[in-house]
Every structure is written in structure tokens, then in C-alpha cells.
UniProtKB/Swiss-Prot annotation:
It comes from the Bacteria. Keywords: Activator, Plasmid, Transcription, Transcription regulation. The keyword Flavoprotein does not apply. InterPro entries: Adhesin_operon_reg_prot, Fimbrial_Adhesin_Reg. It holds the Pfam family PapB. GO terms for biological process: regulation of DNA-templated transcription. Regulates the transcription of genes involved in the biosynthesis of afimbrial adhesin-III. The keyword Transcription regulation applies. It comes from Escherichia coli. This is AFA-III adhesin operon regulatory protein.
Length: 101
């Protein structure tokens, strides 16, 4: 059985779930995400990697819940885009290449 290092291969359409994202994958996504605030990135890490609930993650890093939700949505969008790119780089990944929506 092939070991999987990236969580997106196991989730529907690249959706990230709280507490289930590997640290390495999180930092790769953070590199290409439009989120630049260190506080928000740390709150997202607490939520996605460490498994804190949204309020705990926001409280630990002094991030407003509304801003956190917007940043999480942008982060999810990056993950979903990466998911759609995978077949262009790894055709054996098993999901179809869509030429547009």
C-alpha cells in the first residue's frame, strides 16, 4: 500500500478538515495562499493541524472570528485549486482533468 503524505488525496475535492491536515502540507499551502498575517496563519494552523476549535484558535492568536472565517475560506480555495491541478502533474492520481468549468 502506498503511503500518503498529503491529506488532499483522501478528501473530497481537496477540502481541509480541522485537525486532519499534516503540518508539512499546511506550510506548503500557506506558501501559496493569499493569507499573509502571521497571527491568522498561526490560528489556521491551530485549527487545521492541531485540531483546536475555531474560537480557541482565534483566541490564542487574537484574531477576530469573522476575519478567521474569511481567511479559512481563502485557504480552502487554495487547497481545492491544488486538488484540481494534481492530475496535470500526476495523471495516475485517478481523478479526471477538467478543461474548465
Amino acid at each position: 500500500m502506498r503511503e500518503r503524505y498529503l491529506y488532499l488525496a483522501d478528501t473530497p475535492q481537496g477540502i481541509l478538515m480541522s485537525g486532519q491536515v499534516p503540518e508539512y502540507q499546511f506550510w506548503l499551502l500557506a506558501e501559496i495562499s493569499p493569507v499573509h498575517s502571521e497571527k491568522v496563519i498561526n490560528a489556521l494552523r491551530d485549527y487545521l493541524v492541531m485540531g483546536y476549535n475555531r474560537m480557541e484558535a482565534c483566541g490564542r492568536h487574537s484574531v477576530s472570528p469573522g476575519y478567521f472565517s474569511g481567511a479559512l475560506k481563502r485557504f480552502q480555495r487554495v487547497s481545492q485549486t491544488v486538488y484540481r491541478l494534481v492530475p496535470f502533474y500526476f495523471p495516475e492520481a485517478g481523478h479526471e482533468v477538467h478543461r474548465g468549468e
